[in-house]
A protein has these predicted regions:
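Short, hinge-like loop/turn segments at secondary-structure boundaries
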Residues: 24-25, 100-102, 126-127
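Single conserved hydrophobic/aromatic residue that forms the stacking wall/gate
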Residues: 129-138
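A glycine-rich beta-to-alpha transition motif near the start of alpha/beta enzyme domains, typified by
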Residues: 50-56, 81-107
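Glycine-rich phosphate/adenosyl-contacting loop at the front of the ribokinase-like
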Residues: 1-84
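Short, glycine/serine-rich, charged loops/turns that create anion-binding
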Residues: 12, 88, 137
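Conserved phosphate-binding/catalytic loop of the ribokinase/pfkB sugar-kinase fold
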Residues: 86, 108-113, 121-130
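Short acidic, glycine/serine/threonine-rich loops at helix termini
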Residues: 17-20, 96, 123
Length: 138
């Protein structure tokens, strides 16, 4: 099978929350720079996800990562695309692969039975900034 674009990259699930400036200031106190990407421990990220869910509900979810974003965009513009990546056999890994397929991107990925989870990226969006507190072990 011939593809227009093949990518190799990290399989990330973006969890996007809308936030206000008050939460942005609280993030800065935690050492999370506004408008940047910050690696954080899994427990800290889970605590923030729980806090944001309590404040505003469930996040929007999408497969993500730099290569994934590129291959999905190309697919949505009509290119025949393929993504090569690694995911764990967990909810995020399954969601990632389903979302790739839903966006017309081929893959041959089989989820690994791993102690390391598929990585989520917490995307916080305010009216002025996009901030990425992330953790991606697989």
């Amino acid at each position: 099978m011939k593809y227009d674009l093949c990518c190799l990259g990290s399989a990330i699930v973006d969890l996007t929350f809308q936030i206000d400036e008050k939460f942005t200031r609280e993030n800065e106190k935690r050492g999370i720079a506004k408008g940047g990407m910050t690696l954080m421990e899994k427990n800290d990220q889970n605590n923030m996800i729980n806090e944001l869910t309590e404040l505003g509900g469930l996040p929007e979810k999408a497969c993500g990562g730099s290569a994934t974003n590129s291959v999905v965009a190309a697919s949505l513009f009509g290119s025949k695309c393929y993504m090569s990546c690694i995911v764990a056999n967990d909810a995020n890994g399954k969601f990632y692969l389903e979302d790739l397929s839903k966006n017309g991107v081929g893959h041959g990925t089989k989820p690994l039975n791993s102690e390391l989870p598929s990585g989520p990226c917490l995307v916080t969006v305010s009216y002025t900034h996009l901030t990425l507190p992330t953790n991606h072990p697989v």
